[in-house]
Structure formats: structure tokens, C-alpha cells
UniProtKB/Swiss-Prot annotation:
It is found in: Virion. This is Tail tubular protein A. It comes from Klebsiella phage KP32 (Bacteriophage KP32). Optimum pH is 5.5-6.0. GO terms for biological process: adhesion receptor-mediated virion attachment to host cell; symbiont entry into host cell via disruption of host cell envelope; symbiont entry into host cell via disruption of host cell glycocalyx. Homotetramer. Belongs to the tail tubular protein gp11 family. One of its GO terms (cellular component) is virion component. InterPro entries: Tail_Gp11. Its main location: virion. The gene is 31.
């Protein structure tokens, strides 16, 4: 299983790719076999990049404010898993595939650490508004890079704006925001 398949189930990814193809007036496909179509390969690549880009901002559905990361008992190393998009706060970073503590200058830990973690969620586990935003933004970039149809661009830009607004509404409803100290994302920025 490759990395992109881990976050898009084949049926969900096929649906998303077909939405992208439909946006540019192409016929749907029945398989994600990239050998048969450059359009499918390009659509998948853009879709997965946009998915990571949007999720990496950190949202109520993919921020874990008290994730416990446990080191390997023999090496003391904590792997920085592919699903980890970032650790907020600035103290811990990904260095060579391992969690690295910048304040102590080491990647070896004697015990578990608790962090605020942004993780890449499976497509099917995301709120609908985020799925729509990802597919619409990916469709727009797909059109822009490979076809350049201006009328399609304008239509997709409007749809993307509406999808993003729906995501912002979702975030206001489900995020834990307050005037005094903000959310986990704001705390991460403050800690930099």
C-alpha cells in the first residue's frame, strides 16, 4: 500500500478523481490505474498534495492536543510517523524521520512526551465540507495546470470559496476558540 492509498480509500479516491475529471469535461474512469491515463496520474498527485496542504493547517478534526508519543524501549527514539503533519509548539520537530527535541538538542527520550499533534486523517473520516474543499481546490489546480479553461476556472474558484467558507463555519462551530488564549494552532504560533 503506498502513502496516498493510506489516506484515500480506493473508492473515495476514485470518486474524487472522477469529480476532478468531470470538472474539466472528461469522462469518468473505472480504475485508478495510472498506466492507462496521464490525467488520472496527474489528478491523483494533485489531489494528494492538496489534501496534505489543507490538513497541515490544523483543524478541529485533526489536532490532538494531548497526544502521547512513546519512545522505543531499546533506542529511546520516537518515530515521526508519515501521518504526523506537524507537532505544534516549536520544541519538537521531524529530523531524519525521528522526533527531535530542539531545546535539549537530542532525539533520544527516556520517557513518553505529550504534544499537540496535527495528523493526516483518512479522507472518509474528514467532515464533508473539508472533503468538498479538497476536491474543489484540486480540481481547480488540475484545470489550471493542464487545461486552462477560463470558464471552468471561474466556476471552480467560486465553488472553492464557498467550500472554504463552509470549513471556516465548521471550525467556528467545533473548534475550541476563546478570546484569551486561542486554539491549539494559535498556541503553536505563540510558542514559536
Amino acid at each position: 500500500m503506498n502513502m496516498q492509498d493510506a489516506y484515500f480509500g480506493s473508492a473515495a479516491e476514485l470518486d474524487a478523481v472522477n469529480e476532478m475529471l468531470a470538472a474539466i469535461g472528461e469522462s469518468p474512469v473505472t480504475t485508478l490505474d495510472e498506466d492507462g491515463s496521464a490525467d488520472v496520474a496527474n489528478a491523483r498527485r494533485i489531489l494528494n498534495r492538496i489534501n496534505r496542504q489543507i490538513q497541515s493547517k490544523g483543524w478541529a478534526f485533526n489536532i490532538n492536543e494531548s497526544a502521547t508519543l512513546t519512545p522505543d524501549v531499546s533506542t529511546g527514539l520516537i518515530p515521526f510517523r508519515p501521518a504526523y503533519l506537524s507537532i505544534l509548539g516549536g520544541q519538537y520537530v521531524n529530523r531524519g524521520g525521528w522526533v527531535y527535541d530542539k531545546s535539549t538538542g537530542t532525539d533520544t527520550f527516556s520517557g513518553p512526551i505529550t504534544v499537540t499533534l496535527i495528523t493526516l486523517q483518512d479522507y472518509d473520516e474528514m467532515p464533508e465540507c473539508f472533503r468538498q474543499w479538497i476536491v474543489t481546490k484540486a480540481s481547480r489546480q488540475f484545470n489550471s495546470r493542464f487545461f486552462g479553461a477560463e470558464d471552468v476556472e471561474n466556476s471552480l474558484a467560486q465553488e472553492e470559496m464557498e467550500a472554504r467558507m463552509a470549513c471556516n463555519e465548521y471550525e467556528m462551530d467545533f473548534g475550541q476558540y476563546n478570546m484569551l488564549d486561542g486554539d491549539a494552532y494559535v498556541q503553536g504560533l505563540i510558542g514559536r
